[in-house]
Amino acid sequence: MTASNAAIHLYGASLRHGQVRALDAVSLRIAQGERVAIIGPSGAGKSSLLHLMATAIQPSSGRLELLGEQPWALSARARQRLRARVGLVHQSPPLPPRQRVVTAVLAGRLGQWGTLRGLLNLLYPSDVPGARQVLAELGLADKLFVQCGQLSGGQLQRVGIARALYQRPQVLLTDEPVSAMDPVLADHSLALLNRHAQATGVTLVASLHAVELALAHFPRVIGIREGQVVFDCPAEAVTEQLLDALYANEQLAPPPTQGPTLTVQIPRC
């Protein structure tokens, strides 16, 4: 992979929230059209990493290159144009309760439309067939004119996915996109995202708690722990030993016993 074909390139990126280091010198490259899952324990920094990639937050140190641009070296207007090429699916999509589903989906292209068209779309949805089509792929065609406040958590997540698919971004970042869905819907939704990415050449990155879904749907898996990359390898190379090291919980470990000092090496992919 060369820098020229990297959709996302992080150079020693760190992120601090006050005294807490959320990300610690993360360096990685994700090629255009790649499909990558990010896994790790709660609080590992997965969401922070995705939001940094989306330019929602600026790294405290280090550098991000996104689609060949350095976002934080751009003017605010140029950075906004860059963001319009990136889709971000939130774990809990920030959809107003009284907003209709059709409007929520069409809002995926607000960054590509002018102000007037965006405002008119709130009153008179401009592409009802397009919204219906993408919702149908997620089993929500019958919810087209329902208010978002009437939907379940899993349905809201599917609306968030539909919105991102309608946007047609070059990079699609998804933060726990199926956490509120039952296993069948979660599997279907991730399969749909992957089919869409393969068909359109979109770069797809998803943070997931469910390791089995990450391994089943994504060719490349990155393990994050305490803000650092623990492993980065093909899904078929992820071993039980790697997962044990990634999810080891010192608070749940049994009390230490007296014995010789052991040196433990974490296997590399």
Swiss-Prot record:
Recorded name of the encoding gene: phnC
Q: What is this protein called?
A: Phosphonates import ATP-binding protein PhnC
Query: What does the record give as the reaction this protein catalyses?
Result: phosphonate(out) + ATP + H2O = phosphonate(in) + ADP + phosphate + H(+)
Q: What class of enzyme is it?
A: translocase
The ABC transporter domain extends over 8-251
Record's keyword annotation contains DNA repair: no
Q: Does the keyword Translocase apply?
A: yes
Q: List, alphabetically, the GO terms of the cellular component aspect.
A: plasma membrane
Q: How does it assemble?
A: The complex is composed of two ATP-binding proteins (PhnC), two transmembrane proteins (PhnE) and a solute-binding protein (PhnD).
**Task of the protein:** Part of the ABC transporter complex PhnCDE involved in phosphonates import. Responsible for energy coupling to the transport system.
Which family is this sequence assigned to?
Answer: Belongs to the ABC transporter superfamily. Phosphonates importer (TC 3.A.1.9.1) family.
Q: Which GO terms describe its molecular function?
A: ABC-type phosphonate transporter activity; ATP binding; ATP hydrolysis activity
Q: Where is this protein found?
A: Cell inner membrane
Query: Where does the chain bind ATP?
Result: 40-47
The UniProt entry, under InterPro entries, shows:
AAA+_ATPase, ABC_transporter-like_ATP-bd, ABC_transporter-like_CS, MetN_ABC_transporter-like, P-loop_NTPase
What is the membrane topology listed in the Swiss-Prot or TrEMBL record? Peripheral membrane protein
Q: What is its EC number?
A: 7.3.2.2
Assigned keywords, A-Z: ATP-binding, Cell inner membrane, Cell membrane, Membrane, Nucleotide-binding, Phosphonate transport, Translocase, Transport
